[in-house]
Amino acid sequence: MSVKAKRHLLVGPASLWKMKQDFQIKFLKENGLLPTHKFIDIGCGTLRGGIPLINYLNTANYYGIDVREEALNEGKKGLEEEGLIARDPNLILFEDFRVLDLGVKFDVMFAFSVLFHLEDSIAKSCFEFIARHISDDGVFYANVNDKTQSEGKWLEFPVVYRGVEFYNELAKDNNLTMKTICTLKELGHISNDDRGDLQVMLEFRKDC
């Protein structure tokens, strides 16, 4: 197993890390991400998706937040290996969305394979965080499990299945509008596992 594959085991299957990395930056660029944008990666983990984004965005425009120090430390090793320290990404370890204030308004906010690892109360706090930090013309993208299946655990996190209406209500509570884009498979995410490929990508914007 390669060093990168072993590192990214902290965020998903070793065999899929490159596909998922490529998928994220491709999706974001196709949906308007520019180097000049302020961008936040919610649940950035080991920077599986973050490395190419840090390379693409202007210096210091990438923000990555995570609750796991081990994952962030592995991400920092990846930055060194890729020669990206000078890109000055903002990597932030935190414990609670309710007290996290970055003092930045983001053009693009992204949570890839994160929301379905949050209990309902934490998901609520996450959306409040998003509402505080999204710019007037900003956008938040997130993929979710909207099919009913048996819930379980992944590492120390729950795996929850909630209909998109749950997220629509959170959006309304925070003056955001929600749009369902399509399944990840339709966007080019091909893992040959319907649990991932049939997840739905959602888009949220300020309700102006």
Give the role of each language-model region.
Residues 36-45:
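Conserved class I S-adenosyl-L-methionine
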Residues 107:
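Conserved acidic residues
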Residues 1-31, 46-101, 118-125, 129, ...:
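Class I (Rossmann-like) S-adenosyl-L-methionine-dependent methyltransferase catalytic domain
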